[in-house]
């Protein structure tokens, strides 16, 4: 396992304060605001420690209420909303400086068999047909001041191969879609809880940025303001992030200063393992 991946997994293992209260450290990615994927993943990690052991996370819905500060830890307060025979619903409040910055609901289910069908994975090419995203980020890093250049050029916990590379500081006009192959940068434990938290973390990277593609904008371009409003994930099938997965994202709408993006995550053999959806603020001022 790479050091950077080991650090991320450690970040997602929270300190237990009492039965329903947990503390997580924050990750500095070069921005003052804490990364939303970190908050969702840590909130799910907290919920998993409270949910009954025989139940598996199958969906979560997060509302981001205020920006988090990447220089301070976050407290996660878990509440059980309902405990049924087969399902458990939990709510997690992410708290920083006594303010709730994110509200996450998560549902867990006892595994069972039932009807099966799924969408077909789009035929967009193999991972080796796509460009290594880190190559573009390292080139961008050369043009940035410290400490941002160091963060952009740093090793990442995921290997990512992306179809459309959009410079975050100088966007180009692209289709309202994105296809990204990804896997962990190093061997990952097969523990389903770790796998689901890692997927939740990664799923926040490309979603809402796809809504900028038709408008020739990068998310760090002068005059742009981009912020996630809500983020949802449905976990369908077991998966192993040690192998390549495809996140196929489409933005079907932008209106009123908001953009919407919907994604499907497939294993390389075509199994639909998760669905994602995100709405965010996308505002541009001259």
Curated annotation (Swiss-Prot):
Its EC number is 3.1.2.20. The gene is tesB. SUPFAM superfamilies: Thioesterase/thiol ester dehydrase-isomerase (SSF54637). Belongs to the C/M/P thioester hydrolase family. Keywords: Hydrolase, Lipid metabolism. The keyword Cell inner membrane does not apply. This is Acyl-CoA thioesterase 2. GO terms for cellular component: cytosol. The active site is at 204 (charge relay system), 228 (charge relay system), 278 (charge relay system). Pfam families: 4HBT_3, Acyl_CoA_thio. The keyword Cell inner membrane does not apply. GO terms for biological process: acyl-CoA metabolic process; fatty acid catabolic process. InterPro entries: Acyl-CoA_hotdog, Acyl_CoA_thio, HotDog_dom_sf, TesB_ACOT8-like_N, TesB_C. The lineage of its organism: Bacteria, Pseudomonadati, Pseudomonadota, Gammaproteobacteria, Pasteurellales. Homotetramer. Thioesterase that has relatively broad substrate specificity, hydrolyzing primarily medium- and long-chain acyl-CoA substrates to free fatty acids and CoA. It comes from the Bacteria. It catalyses: a fatty acyl-CoA + H2O = a fatty acid + CoA + H(+). GO terms for molecular function: fatty acyl-CoA hydrolase activity.
């Amino acid at each position: 396992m790479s050091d950077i991946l080991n650090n991320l997994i450690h970040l997602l293992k929270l300190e237990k304060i009492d039965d329903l209260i947990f503390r997580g450290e924050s990750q500095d990615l070069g921005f003052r605001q804490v990364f939303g994927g970190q908050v969702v993943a840590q909130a799910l990690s907290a919920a998993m420690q409270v949910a009954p052991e025989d139940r598996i996370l199958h969906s979560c819905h997060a509302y981001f209420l205020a920006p988090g500060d990447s220089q301070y830890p976050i407290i996660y307060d878990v509440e059980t909303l309902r405990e049924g025979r087969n399902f458990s619903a939990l709510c997690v409040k992410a708290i920083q400086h006594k303010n709730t910055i994110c509200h996450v609901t998560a549902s867990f289910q006892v595994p069972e068999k039932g009807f099966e069908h799924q969408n077909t994975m789009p035929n967009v090419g193999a991972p080796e047909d796509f460009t290594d995203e880190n190559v573009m980020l390292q080139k961008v890093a050369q043009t940035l001041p410290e400490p941002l250049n160091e963060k952009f050029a740093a090793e990442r916990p995921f290997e990512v191969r992306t179809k459309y590379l959009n410079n975050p500081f100088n966007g180009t006009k692209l289709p309202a879609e994105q296809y990204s192959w990804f896997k962990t940068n190093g061997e990952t434990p097969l523990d389903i809880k770790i796998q689901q938290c890692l997927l939740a973390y990664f799923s926040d990277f490309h979603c809402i940025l796809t809504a900028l593609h038709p408008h020739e904008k990068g998310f760090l371009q002068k005059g742009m303001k981009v912020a996630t409003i809500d983020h949802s994930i449905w976990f369908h099938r077991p998966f192993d992030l040690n192998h390549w997965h495809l996140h196929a994202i489409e933005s079907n709408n932008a209106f009123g200063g908001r953009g919407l993006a919907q994604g499907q995550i497939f294993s390389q053999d075509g199994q639909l393992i998760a669905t994602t959806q995100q709405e965010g603020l996308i505002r541009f001022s001259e």
